[in-house]
Structures are given as structure tokens and as C-alpha cells.
Regions:
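Proline-centered helix-kink/hinge sites
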Residues: 16, 41, 95, 111, ...
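Short, glycine-rich, amphipathic interfacial segments at transmembrane boundaries or analogous
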Residues: 41-57, 61, 114-153, 214-235
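Extended hydrophobic-aromatic, low-complexity segments
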Residues: 100, 125-128, 139-143, 169-173, ...
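A short, structured surface patch at a secondary-structure boundary
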Residues: 147-210, 252-256, 260
Length: 267
């Protein structure tokens, strides 16, 4: 009666199902009256564009809709776009990469390109190649170190190419090879993956899609290197992995172009 009087369209259930705790009779009456009944995880996913780790549970991930990126048609369409777009991009990018490589060499000691092992789809390792933007002794102690905002290890040329995202242009070759996609979660180092997987749930599920040059987390969350930052970015990565569509990829690419034109959030 209250739902009808107040013209309620949706009821969001924030309770976990426990014996004698869920008002099943009331919910059934509301649902049969035409009111949509939703639970909190689905509601937050829809309203925030991320999977809320505080409310989600394994059964929700198993039984809710999504995770269609592995279907043959979706995977084929995404791969076809990646191959065509990366092939086209590499043609004008080649002279830019070459010129930038010379500037990197003149600016600081060390190689022009930076190679590093990253974790790809389904946990498979691959070698990522970027134009070097930090000093060659950035990790001289041999331990993986999180990059920081205004990191003092970044060179003069490195600061510019990071702001313009030129350092990431060589990754188009990884996309053409099929190790990466244009859109997907950020590829992390194995050391960081091992560390984060022990501290937050469902971290491995972000690897059901290929890592990307840009992604849903990158355009929705500012750069950060703390554990809390990683948790928030994981929520966006899980949303992308669960809700992938070609339209979502197009939206992310358009937002990435906006960031390139107005690079106020460059790391």
C-alpha cells in the first residue's frame, strides 16, 4: 500500500539473506504490484559504473548478467578493431616514436625504450615496451616501486611525453600482436599483482580481458599508487570486464581523446 501511495518505482535491498531476516512476503507483494526489486550490488553497479567491493559476494558475480567479452563474436569484433586501428596508428606514430627516442637518448643516459614484464589476459606474462620516461637507475635497488605523482625519477623529456601519452605509443605494437587491446585494465607488474591479489578480493577477475592502453578505470579515477587507489581502480576494472560492449569501448576511446586534448590528469 505504501509503495503504491508513494508511487515507488524501485526498492533496493541492502540486507544479506538470512533465515527469518529477509521480509520475503512484503517483497513478493511489492514485486507483484509492479515495483522493481533490486539488491544493493546491482544498484550500485548501475548508478556508479563500478563493482562495489564492500557489498559484492561471489554468488552475485556468478549469477548476475555480464562477462560476455569471452564470447566468440565479441572477442572477434574487439580483435578486428584492435588489428585495424593499431595498424593504422603505427604508420603516423613511427616517426614520432623515432624522434622521441632520440630526444630521450640526448636527455638522459640509458636506452630510449623501456621493457618490462607485465601480466596479461588470464595471467599470461608478456613484455611491454614504452619510451623511457624515468632515469635508467629508477629501480637500482632491484625492487618494484610504485610510480608517484610528480615522481622525481621522471626526466625532463619524460615529463612531457607522459603528459602527452607519447611514451605509450609503442604499445600499439603489443595491440597488433594481440597481447594487449586498445581498451582494457592497466597491465600491472607480476610483483604488484601478487601483492594486490592477497589484499583484495576478485583481483584475478580483472585479467579475464586483455590489458589495454586506456581503460574504464583510467578515465574515471585519477592516478594514484596507494592500496586504496588500487581498490577503487579494481572496482572500475571489474565493471569493464563484466559489462564490456563495443559501445563502452567507443565511449572510453572518446573520453581518452578528451584527456589527450586537455591532459590535466596526466600521471
Amino acid at each position: 500500500e505504501y509503495a503504491r501511495t508513494m508511487r515507488v518505482d524501485e526498492v533496493v535491498l541492502a540486507l544479506q539473506e538470512r533465515r527469518n531476516a529477509m521480509p520475503v512476503a512484503d517483497l513478493l507483494r511489492i514485486r507483484t504490484a509492479g515495483v522493481h526489486v533490486n539488491e544493493i550490488s546491482t544498484f550500485l553497479e548501475r548508478e556508479t559504473g563500478r563493482v562495489d567491493l564492500r557489498s559484492v559476494n561471489p554468488s552475485w558475480l556468478i549469477f548476475s548478467d555480464g562477462f560476455s567479452s569471452g564470447r566468440r563474436l565479441s572477442a572477434w569484433a574487439k580483435r578486428a578493431f584492435d588489428m585495424i586501428a593499431s595498424g593504422i596508428l603505427l604508420i603516423p606514430a613511427a616517426p614520432v616514436i623515432g624522434l622521441t627516442a632520440l630526444l630521450v637518448k640526448f636527455d638522459s643516459k640509458g636506452p630510449a625504450f623501456y621493457r618490462q614484464i607485465r601480466v596479461g589476459q588470464y595471467g599470461a606474462p608478456f613484455t611491454i615496451v614504452k619510451l623511457r620516461s624515468m632515469r635508467s637507475d629508477a629501480e637500482i635497488v632491484g625492487e618494484a616501486v610504485w610510480a608517484e605523482k610528480d615522481d622525481p625519477r621522471i626526466t625532463r623529456v619524460g615529463r612531457i611525453i607522459r603528459k602527452l601519452r607519447i611514451d605509450e605509443l609503442p604499445q600499439a605494437w603489443m595491440v597488433l600482436k594481440g597481447e594487449m587491446s586498445f581498451v582494457g585494465p592497466r597491465p600491472e607488474r607480476p610483483e604488484f599483482v601478487d601483492q594486490l591479489a592477497t589484499k583484495m578480493p576478485y583481483f584475478a577477475e580483472r585479467h579475464v580481458v586483455k590489458p589495454g592502453i586506456t581503460g574504464w578505470a583510467q578515465i574515471n579515477y585519477p592516478y594514484g599508487a596507494s592500496l586504496d587507489d588500487s581498490r577503487h581502480k579494481l572496482e572500475y576494472d571489474l565493471y569493464y570486464a563484466k559489462n564490456y560492449t563495443p559501445f563502452l569501448d567507443i565511449l572510453i576511446l572518446l573520453q581518452t581523446v578528451r584527456v589527450l586534448l586537455w591532459p590535466d590528469g596526466a600521471r
